[in-house]
Amino acid sequence: MSNEEKSLHISKCLELAILLEVGAEKPGNVNFTSGFKGTRCEHFLASAVAAGPAFQTAAYRGILVAKSKLGICEVGLGQLIKTCAADIKAWQKGGNTILGTIMLFMPVAVAAGMAPTKKNYAFDLSLLRKNIDLAVKSTTALDSVHLYEAVDIANPSGLNDAPDLDVTDPRSKERLIKENVSLYEVFKIASGYDDVCSEWVHNYPVTFDLAYPYLMEQLKSKPLNTAVVHTFLKILSERPDTFIARKVGKEKAQEVSLDAKAVLELGGLETAKGKKSLRQFDKKLRLSKNKCNPGTTADLTAAALALCTLSGYRP
């Protein structure tokens, strides 16, 4: 496999993961049958396609790192995320769709580029995880600035005042450079209230240790939609959604987690009671003008699917 073929392969794996996540009928999220005001499924589908070139570039840079043709500090994760955010905005009109997902995916793309592939073009996930850690810990202050610019481009909701280096404060970018604050350090500040940042800082524990193993076990005996929805519920039941917490408070996020746990305990999509409970849960999440949309849980579900596709899974 040539460098170009490998980087394209990685990009396709990540695009597919986004498409599979979006297509699943997860409660409170946008899917093929339910949307938000101004944001529908087609916006997410367009976003997945638009993200492809940046994923491919990230993977290619990872390949160059492995060949000692590029320093790992020169990968430019922040710039890659910014470019990806701009491409996504140019290709759809539904506002911010997958910023959290591309923040999680970009280090994965670089890490996969750094790793050798097996005969079936799958990746060793233990090595992938080590490479992710190297990539995120090698970020720079310039990566931080570019990430802040990516947030400006995507304009996500739910941004509250941060304890330090607030992304909505124009002065923060100057401080990032002046104080030489790497993107890893920025995410460390935010890791206590944002699970996407927490994944970066703690080497993707929810993705690798909870979501992916559970998803793979589900896929052994269940259809894809059921497996993805159940994985989403499993994550949500154990990790109160930080997107919800930032919008409406930790107490409400905890309540949503308990509801997700109850749906799973009733059998989820495999029993009549579980299906009824899931429908009620979905309706409840949509009542508050989608302020209870488990958006971070969707990002983590997508990350688990990315590990699946990089491991060789195909629908």
Predicted regions: what is each one?
Residues 1-75, 112-288, 308-315:
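Phosphate-rich cofactor/ligand-interacting catalytic cores and adjacent structured alpha/beta frameworks
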Residues 71-92:
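Active-site cofactor/substrate anionic-group-binding motifs, chiefly glycine-
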Residues 78-85, 102-105, 129:
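Generic internal hydrophobic packing segments that stabilize the cores of diverse globular domains
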Residues 80, 100-104, 147, 224-231, ...:
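Residue-level detector of well-ordered alpha-helical segments, enriched
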Residues 86, 106-110, 133:
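A broadly conserved amphipathic alpha-helix scaffold signal in soluble, globular proteins
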Residues 88-95, 99, 112-119:
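Amphipathic alpha-helical interaction segments
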Residues 92-107, 290-306:
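Conserved phosphate/anionic-ligand binding catalytic regions in large, soluble enzymes, centered on
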